[in-house]
């Protein structure tokens, strides 16, 4: 049934779109004299010497408001049609945008103002309305002469601490002779100078105290700019302030005036008065995250560093810094008060999930998590998780327990680096972390096997910038042990050598490193990039040490062992690259994703450990195929294996790509059209799985392709996703039948 449906889907979709396009005539619903506004077009008439500027053109086009009614797939006004037919009381659609709601003269004035701000001082903007019987569009025309450019940049004023500091900041100026005159750049320069002066202690200075004088009389389309300080600014704005006093109030609450409530112990720590109301934190630990020091000039950077570090500790609900003038004997001094309000430090959480699989197995999973954010009074995060669940068959006349699982995991995260040597506080903006993890897991499939696993790791996490994060685990340990097997399972392993190797005891020991780049917090961008890349190594140092000590050569048939068990030796690299293109009005998004990975076993091992292999298929992969059911290559799983729920297809190489177009429908409902492609392969031949090895001449023909559509319920705090996908190419089918 899958193949006819796959071939019919494109035709059905095309027919649906054709019917919708033919039936969506919206002008018939307009009243007498009304015209549907269909949009605007902009023409730039450039005189010789005027540069091309796509950014400026985009900015002008964004002023052409309002937007006309949106279209579905660029073909028809779906939401306008839904509004016109009155479906669900017109709540699913959008009302028509009429020509009478457009103010083209106002739009033209805004365009003129923007061009003036960009240095096009001699320009004209006009518009015409092109009207049909029921529709109308507006044509805007801007005549541009070459823009004015910056001639010279000077700083006016006699020598003084403020004027001298102002001149010193000009080494980093944004204004350069020859650059186009731009009012936005002048505003950025004023903000930059204000920030630079605050770094030098000018606490009371403000950007509005700066004045740019522009003179275009020099000719040759140049503007000379002179920077000066306005007259009559407050005297405090011209003085450099230093810290006279520093008070830290730990356990502060808005329900009381902490300065007046007795009972808070006050101690002197590094020259600061530390007032402790709740005695939950070690004062010396808190002071390591405070960069404001008595006797030092005020610095905006140190202010921000203090706020960031204290909040990133994860133990404070609110952090506030208040500055008071404390002039003494004519000296410009500041008193700083740091208020720390802690969060609830100990929590416990229970989570119940229902699991349903495509092999007719279902059951509950219960997870309980205890979290202590301040284990040793230094913001040490301790997490203890317990989980358990079972699966039982439903339907098909089956009954009884099929499997159960249980696990315990403990993690300790410290807000600093733990190293055998001293590290300077180079990662001062973000809190560096050391984490230690230990976990035990039991999986019992009653008819087949009982498996035990142990995981442990020690490593570091630190952020280089807001968008860059590093995760390095010098020690990562995994032991997977098949404790018990049934005769039925042994017979299955004997018939499938690869399956047997996949379930052999796996001892993994080695380092891993992950780099993450994510600029999605930068909301002013139209395009966002996410990248995650990792490298995972196992057994290499052990293998080197044992080969030097034993002077014998190991092989997969005669491997080196540790604690009486052979260990895995491999190298694994994987990347996850995502790109998001967002429309100017934030309504639509084109999301693309590329995933690639390769793992290679050598030395002590002939195959990658099963837990380190790659899989494809499922709701977060190629959605038209069941989870972990694709590949490797063109290999088709025999029915005897497919009937067993524990057999997943895995490989050493993975390629996967996705493209998804997301668009609004109504209210919180959004739609999505997507295409997925991908597969996995083996590095080496496996006689039991023909067609599974990666070959450069055939791998493109073995990539599975699926497509579909979905809806998203965007509730801001979470998104509910429903997708319907269809396979377009099935690589396990014979050649000529895959599409």
Feature map (PLM): residue ranges:
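C-terminal motif of bacterial Sec signal peptides marking the signal peptidase cleavage site
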Residues: 20-23
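Interaction-mediating elements
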Residues: 25-312, 318-321, 333, 426, ...
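In a subset of proteins, long, contiguous C-terminal domains/tails are tracked
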Residues: 5, 530, 554-557, 561, ...
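C-terminal outer-membrane beta-barrel translocator/porin domains of Gram-negative envelope proteins
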Residues: 261, 271-276, 355-359, 471-663, ...
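Flexible glycine-/small-residue-rich
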Residues: 46, 142-146, 157-159, 227-233, ...
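Bacterial N-terminal signal peptides that target proteins for export
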Residues: 1-12
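C-terminal soluble interaction/assembly domains
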Residues: 293-299, 372, 693-701, 707, ...
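Gram-negative/organellar outer-membrane beta-barrel architecture
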Residues: 162, 279-280, 299-532, 623-624, ...
């Amino acid at each position: 049934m899958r193949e006819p449906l796959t071939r019919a889907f494109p035709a059905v979709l095309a027919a649906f779109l054709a019917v919708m396009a033919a039936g969506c005539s919206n002008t018939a619903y307009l009243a007498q004299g009304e015209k549907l506004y269909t949009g605007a077009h902009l023409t730039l008439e450039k005189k010789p010497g005027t540069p091309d500027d796509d950014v400026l053109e985009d900015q002008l086009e964004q002023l052409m408001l309002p937007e006309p009614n949106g279209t579905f797939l660029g073909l028809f006004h779906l939401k306008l049609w839904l509004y016109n037919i009155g479906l669900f009381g017109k709540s699913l659609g959008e009302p028509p945008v009429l020509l009478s709601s457009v103010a083209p003269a106002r739009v033209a004035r805004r365009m003129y103002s923007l061009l003036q701000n960009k240095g096009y001082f001699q320009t004209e903007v006009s518009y015409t309305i092109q009207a049909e019987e029921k529709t109308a569009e507006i044509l805007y025309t801007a005549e541009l002469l070459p823009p004015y450019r910056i001639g010279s940049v000077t700083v006016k004023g006699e020598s003084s601490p403020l004027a001298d500091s102002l001149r010193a900041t000009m080494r980093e100026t944004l204004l350069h002779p020859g650059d186009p005159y731009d009012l936005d750049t002048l505003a950025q320069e004023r903000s930059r100078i204000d920030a630079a002066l605050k770094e030098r202690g000018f606490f009371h200075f403000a950007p509005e105290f700066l004045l740019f004088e522009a003179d275009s009389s020099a000719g040759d389309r140049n503007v000379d700019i002179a920077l000066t300080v306005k007259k009559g600014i407050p005297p405090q704005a011209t003085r450099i302030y230093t810290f006279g006093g520093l008070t830290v109030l730990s356990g502060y609450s808005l329900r009381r005036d902490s300065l007046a409530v007795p009972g808070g112990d006050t101690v002197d720590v590094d020259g600061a008065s530390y007032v402790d109301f709740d005695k939950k934190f070690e004062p010396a630990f808190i002071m390591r995250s405070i960069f404001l020091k008595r006797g030092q000039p005020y610095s905006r950077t140190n202010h921000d560093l203090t706020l960031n570090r204290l909040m990133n500790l994860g133990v404070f609900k609110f952090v506030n810094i208040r500055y008071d003038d404390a002039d003494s004997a004519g000296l410009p001094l500041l008193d700083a008060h740091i208020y720390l309000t802690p969060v609830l430090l100990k929590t416990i959480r229970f989570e119940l999930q229902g699991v349903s699989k495509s092999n007719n197995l279902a059951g509950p999973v219960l997870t309980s998590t205890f979290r202590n954010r301040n284990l040793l009074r230094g913001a040490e995060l301790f997490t203890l998780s317990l989980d358990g669940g079972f699966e039982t068959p439903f339907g098909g006349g089956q009954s009884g327990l099929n499997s159960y699982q249980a696990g315990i995991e403990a993690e300790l995260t410290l807000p600093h680096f733990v190293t055998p040597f001293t590290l300077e506080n180079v990662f001062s903006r973000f809190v560096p972390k050391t984490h230690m993890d230990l976990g035990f897991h039991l999986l019992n499939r009653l008819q087949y096997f009982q498996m035990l696993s142990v995981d442990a790791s020690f490593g570091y996490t630190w952020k280089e910038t807001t968008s860059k994060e590093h995760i390095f685990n010098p020690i990562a340990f995994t032991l997977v042990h098949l404790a018990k097997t049934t005769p039925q399972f042994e017979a299955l392993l004997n018939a499938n050598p690869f399956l047997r190797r996949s379930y052999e005891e796996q001892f993994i020991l080695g380092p891993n490193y992950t780099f993450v780049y994510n600029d999605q917090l930068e909301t002013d961008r139209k395009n966002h990039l996410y990248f995650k890349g990792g490298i995972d190594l196992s057994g290499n140092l052990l293998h080197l040490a044992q080969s030097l000590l034993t002077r014998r050569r190991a092989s997969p048939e005669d491997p080196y062992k540790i604690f009486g068990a052979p260990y895995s030796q491999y190298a694994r690299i994987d990347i996850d690259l995502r790109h998001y293109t967002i429309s100017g009005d934030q309504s639509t998004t084109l999301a693309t994703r590329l995933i690639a990975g390769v793992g290679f076993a050598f030395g002590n091992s002939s195959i990658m450990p099963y837990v380190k292999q790659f899989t494809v298929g499922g709701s977060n992969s190629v959605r038209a195929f069941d989870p972990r059911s694709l590949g490797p290559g063109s290999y088709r799983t025999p029915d005897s294996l497919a009937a067993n729920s524990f057999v997943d297809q895995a490989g050493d190489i993975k390629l996967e790509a996705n493209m998804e177009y997301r668009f609004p429908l109504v209210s919180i409902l959004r739609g999505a059209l997507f295409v997925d492609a991908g597969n996995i392969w083996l590095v080496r031949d496996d006689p039991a799985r023909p067609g599974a090895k990666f070959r450069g001449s055939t791998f493109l023909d073995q990539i599975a392709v699926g497509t579909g559509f979905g809806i998203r319920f965007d509730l801001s705090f979470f998104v509910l996703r429903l997708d319907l996908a269809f396979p377009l190419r099935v690589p396990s089918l014979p050649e000529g039948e895959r599409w």
